[in-house]
Amino acid sequence: MSEEVQSDVKRFLDRLDERVAERLAAQGTEPSWIAARRQAGAARFEALGFPHRRIEEWKYTDVRAIARGDFRLATDADFSPATAARLTLPVEAHRLTFVDGVFAPALSRLDDLPGGVQLVPLSRALEENHEAVGGPLGRLTGVEFSPFAALNTAFMEEGAVLRLAPGTVVEKPIILQFLSRAGEAPVMSHPRILLEMAGRSQATVIEHHVGEEQAANFTNLVEEIILDRGAILTHYKLQEAPLGDLHVASIHIEQARDSRYTSFNLNLGGGLVRNDLVAELNGQGAETHFNGLFYGQGRQHVDNHTLVNHNAPHTFSHENYKGILDDRAHGVFNGKVIVKRDSQKIEAEQSNANLLLSDRAEIDTKPELEIYADDVKCAHGATTGQLDEEAVFALRTRGIDAQTARGLLTLAFAGEVLEQVDLDAIAERVELAVAGKLPERFNLAGLVETAAALNEE
């Protein structure tokens, strides 16, 4: 490890020492298992350092903007209520809100939770019954997974815990909102999310990352999702962070028999974004659906790595990721499916399609299949291209000008993912965001109206 890298690592570990000292001075000792895991995370991070491009899984993503950053840790959750209202999704929901990683009770809504649902900030869950949290926390995403997972474990202090009792059906969505502030100095946060759904429970969770336009912070999230037999979860991750923000997320899902997990990974913001999404299909009848849409412009960098492990027979996975890249944006997609030995009668389908709106935009895509069973149905594919000029011409013959035609085709490309979204507020928000990012700067209302009229014909 070079002296420069050692210096970067030391700067983060110094921040950790400062934070631990502050916490101990304010609260006294912490449970021994928390201290042990924190130390393990710090030791692993110190040994690994930040990932570099000589590592295969990071060969297209440069994290020096994170490594060289001098990030502080937030100590309060002050945020303009008016700004928060403007940024919040217009969805009737239960909501936990965090500002730069600090729980914001004034911006949360927990007063009408139904029976069978526990939704609390991680800090409160640890205070009330830390032993109940200690078992599952870190079981799926340990310090060995990546340097960022180790760093998150070292700094672990806040996040969300969501537990559903057997047979519980939550009618309203649950929103986990993460707000990023524009301050005098950049800050970092390391939220930890633990979601446990007992048998036959059902919920929709919206994870929303958004913030003030001039914010330039670092979010390093770890999320562990455990679905018991027959549990059903729809998980929206809407990432609209400011372009100055840096965002890393590690999400692990463990699925028991007959459970179903549906993910919508929607990335519109952030200057540097890395998502790792891993599903473990451990019981027969388990289903995983990965849907993704990312839009990059300027010099945005968006990297999506997905992994589905078919660990049991009669399991099913479907993946559809689409990327739209403009200017000098860079996208990365690495989707991997592993079919374990004796996992017969599985079905796995994977697709990645990318649309380049600029000659300088770049995509690196790598779909992978590893199959160690012989009675399976598997398919994968990736395509990259520009808008179909024949389709543009066809729209122009209907009286639509060239710029609007290109905008409509781009929206249609995104729409193949968005039409699967059941929540209109999210689908419409993403659709308008995509239209607003298009290079021609269309009249948004007119463009959407034209698209709607064509759909009705």
Where in the sequence are the language-model features?
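Conserved beta-strand/loop scaffold segments within soluble protein domains that form the structured core
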Residues: V5, Q118, L122, E128-I400, ...
